[in-house]
């Protein structure tokens, strides 16, 4: 028999579960005025996110809906054949080609700001309006990977009156090309918060005139690799008497792992940390080029 399975899901709940509250100190919390826990949305009033592609350094925009897309194309083949003499042959095979995505919209620090701190909201006409009050910083982490998996098992067995022997082969293969792209931004603390705009500082580096800053400086990752495992096994199941049974076997495995990531070291052998604008091909302050290894 052959089975084809297609899946297409968009899981937004992880991006919408954050909420501000006041911690009382005795283990309980109070609601912030105007924000109902469990009933108010703390997701900013924008439907798109901007990010820097870790692989190319390109600036891209994607909707929150598309950023949570996970799709799978899976083919399964199952076969079993029996001979009259007790011999049986099984084949089980599965191939999966998938796109996996996971989107965080993680609240970070919350601070109270005054007008002198230079935060503004933007009106529908594009005009900036000075803002003071609580400011919530947030990290958007867009995780996405292309995955290919292959599983294959074939087994030949024969059953006698008091014993059964089996010989089989397992083959497992997994290939992944994964990256996480992170973007920082600030917003007001209220239901359906507004994005906040501010000037660059020594620690904050915006992308143009947008509210997004410090692209790929926090938690950005890249990994591309594969794993292959091949095994040969044999077993013998023997009922010596009605009370005694012996079951033994042997298994021989070959495993190979290979991959590259962005654990980059400079000429002195020290690790190079993330920085604003981090991506494959970027150059760190000490001149180290960011490249998979």
Go through each PLM region and give its residues:
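Structural signature of Gram-negative outer-membrane beta-barrels, strongest in the C-terminal barrel
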Residues: 2-5, 147-149, 159, 164-174, ...
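Acidic/polar loop-and-plug regions of large Gram-negative outer-membrane beta-barrel proteins
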Residues: 3-76, 101-142, 196-218
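Acidic surface patches and DE-rich sequence motifs
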Residues: 53, 83, 123, 266, ...
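Intrinsic disorder/low-complexity detector
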Residues: 28, 47, 91-94, 238-241
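C-terminal/domain-terminus segments
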Residues: 72, 96-110, 182-188, 192, ...
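Intrinsically disordered, low-complexity segments enriched in small/polar residues
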Residues: 2, 40, 49, 79, ...
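Context-gated lysine
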Residues: 30, 59-61, 71, 80, ...
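Transmembrane beta-barrel strand/turn architecture of Gram-negative outer membrane proteins
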Residues: 1-21, 67-103, 141-182, 292-293
């Amino acid at each position: 028999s052959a089975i084809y399975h297609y899946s297409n899901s968009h899981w937004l709940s992880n991006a919408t579960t954050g909420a501000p509250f006041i911690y009382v100190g005795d283990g309980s919390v109070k609601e912030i005025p105007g924000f109902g826990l469990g009933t108010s949305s703390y997701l900013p009033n924008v439907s798109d996110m901007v990010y820097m592609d870790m692989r190319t350094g390109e600036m891209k925009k994607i909707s929150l809906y598309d950023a949570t897309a996970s799709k799978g194309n899976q083919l399964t083949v199952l076969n079993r054949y029996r001979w009259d003499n007790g011999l049986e042959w099984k084949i089980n095979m599965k191939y999966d080609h998938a796109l996996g995505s996971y989107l965080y919209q993680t609240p970070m620090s919350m601070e109270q700001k005054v007008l002198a701190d230079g935060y503004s909201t933007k009106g529908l006409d594009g005009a900036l309006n000075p803002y003071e009050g609580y400011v919530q910083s947030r990290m958007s982490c867009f995780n996405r990977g292309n995955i290919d998996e292959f599983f294959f098992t074939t087994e030949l067995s024969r059953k006698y009156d008091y014993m059964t022997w089996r010989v089989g082969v397992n083959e497992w293969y997994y290939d992944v090309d994964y990256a996480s792209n992170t973007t920082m931004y600030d917003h007001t603390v209220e239901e359906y918060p507004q994005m906040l705009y501010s000037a660059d500082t020594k620690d904050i580096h915006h992308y143009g005139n947008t509210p997004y800053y410090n692209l790929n400086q926090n938690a950005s990752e890249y990994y591309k690799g594969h794993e292959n495992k091949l095994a040969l096994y044999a077993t013998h199941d023997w009922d010596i008497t009605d009370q005694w049974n012996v079951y033994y076997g042997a298994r021989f495995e070959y495993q190979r792992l290979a991959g590259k990531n962005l654990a980059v070291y400079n000429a002195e052998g020290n690790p190079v940390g993330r920085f604003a604008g981090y991506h494959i091909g970027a150059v760190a302050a000490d001149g180290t080029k960011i490249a998979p290894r």
